[in-house]
């Protein structure tokens, strides 16, 4: 029997942004559990125009790749700020602090992370990019 899971990221996965005080400027749908991922994490995220995630974060074990689906913005990686746009893929190694910001039209992106890590892998720093 084939082993697979199909979920719609917009309708089948809850927006967790309100739980973390990020709404209404941020939409964040973490699909790892809904997809029954064994070795990776996946999220769908949307930033309103000129909105920034309210914290920076880094992981002790997990590497992440962000893919911009639409819009544009900027990403801060430690002390380096880069402009990013549609179809850009950004790999961020563990131990690199990161934060994203939507451009004038906002930004929608998917984030992939591996390996799948237990709670506590991320260090969250509120207001890191201010």
Regions found by a protein language model. Give the residues of each.
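Short acidic-glycine-tyrosine-enriched beta hairpin
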Residues: 79-95
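A short, N-terminal "cap"/entry segment at the start of jelly-roll beta-barrel domains
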Residues: 1-39, 49, 121-130
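A generic "binding-loop/recognition-motif" signal
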Residues: 61, 80, 96, 105-106
């Amino acid at each position: 029997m084939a082993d697979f899971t199909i979920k719609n990221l917009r309708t089948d996965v809850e927006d967790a942004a309100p739980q973390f005080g990020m709404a209404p400027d941020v939409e964040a749908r973490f699909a790892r559990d809904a997809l029954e991922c064994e070795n990776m994490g996946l999220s769908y995220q949307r930033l309103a125009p000129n909105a920034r995630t309210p914290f920076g974060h880094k992981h002790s074990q997990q590497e992440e790749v962000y893919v911009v689906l639409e819009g544009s913005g900027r990403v801060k990686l430690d002390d380096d700020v880069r402009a990013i746009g549609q179809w850009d893929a950004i790999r961020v190694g563990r131990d690199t602090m990161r934060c994203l910001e939507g451009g004038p039209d906002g930004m929608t992106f998917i984030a992939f992370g591996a390996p799948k890590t237990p709670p506590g892998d991320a260090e969250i720093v509120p207001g890191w990019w201010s």
